[in-house]
Every structure is written in C-alpha cells, then in structure tokens.
Amino acid sequence: MVQISTDYVFDGSATTPYAADHPQAPCSAYGRTKAAGEWAVRLADPASMVVRTAWLYGDHGPSFVKTMLRLAKERETISVVDDQTGQPTWA
C-alpha cells in the first residue's frame, strides 16, 4: 500500500531538510488529516510506504513553475518569497 502525503505534516520551522522519521507537528487541518492518514496506513499495513511530496508541477494544471515563467514573460521584474527551500517535483 502506498500513501501519498505532504510536507504539511511538519510545522515548517526546520532550517534543514526533514528526515523521514522527523516528529510530525502539523499546523493545519490539512496537515493533521495527512498525518492521520499516514498513521492509519502504517497501522493497517506495516509494509506500506508513505511518499511525501510538495512543489508539484507538470504539463497539466497550474503550478508555481508555470506561474513564474508566465510572469517572467509579462513583467520586467518579479518578486517571490526567498525564505523557503524546496524540491520542485515533476508530476
């Protein structure tokens, strides 16, 4: 069994990448439901796998990458957050 989850199971305060076994501390209802889903899957099948992903982009649907490319064409200067680190994931 594979559970698709998210980095929202963490509180976002880490200054280095989260390890797979880092203690969960969700700050939102969404994060809490994802954490509960992870727990339920592991309880149901100890051989299960949890895949946490974020910053998805691809050919279909909106994404940060597509938005930045569009804005770069439309504007001379664009502003983005500079206090986040992530790994864009092709989906």
Ranges and model annotations:
Residues 2-3, 50:
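Hydrophobic residues in well-ordered beta-strands that form the structural core
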